[in-house]
Amino acid sequence: GNNKENVIEVKHLNKSFGTHEVLKDIDFSVEKGEVVCIIGSSGSGKSTLLRCINLLEIPSGGEIIYNGENILDEKHDIYKYRTKLGMVFQQFNLFNNHNVLGNCTVGQIKVLKRSKQEAEEVAMKYLKIVGMEQFINAKPKQLSGGQKQRVAIARALSMEPDVILFDEPTSALDPEMVGEVLKVMKELADSGLTMLVVTHEMGFAKLLYGF
């Protein structure tokens, strides 16, 4: 497609830690409404790639083009860019001191400056989508791994980002919980959400692409 449709374009991305080259000359793009799966074994640099895209790690070379601009340019507003990227981590990274609703509103209120009422309405919309609306008063420690990850997905959705990055979203889950998270991800993919998924699981790719 033409460049307007690319949400993120990675060009010649390199990342080294000392003399150890983890990423070498990586090129790919994520189009609006597309789901890109990066599949590889643990330790193959997949998570490093995501950490470079959301600038938790600074790439050693190359470009990350977002809306036509290289966000690695010094003048770029990294903070603003980061708010446009949703992130779902392997370990959920929920705020343990907040209940489920609070987890899904705190970023909206602090970063997007939404009112508490608006933030709660948005959060409820996405908690319903992931099937967690009846747990709004629960603390993370009261939830199963699958429930925590569904809350983490709702939290990312509540920021209404341009793309959501998923870093091994099912690898910390007990096998019987993987299905409920994949089901939510499949529904989101079918709804036209732009997603970049790093996983060592063929299961999600099979579900998504139907092979």
Task: State each model region's role.
Residues 70, 105, 116-135, 183:
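Conserved ABC ATPase "signature" region
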Residues 158-162:
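A short, proline-enriched helix->beta-strand linker immediately N-terminal to the Walker B motif
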Residues 71-86, 116:
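ABC ATPase NBD coupling module
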Residues 164-167:
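Catalytic Walker B motif of ABC-type/P-loop ATPase nucleotide-binding domains
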Residues 139-143, 147:
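Conserved ABC ATPase signature
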Residues 62-73:
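Conserved ABC transporter NBD signature motif
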Residues 54:
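Helix-to-loop junction immediately C-terminal to a conserved catalytic motif
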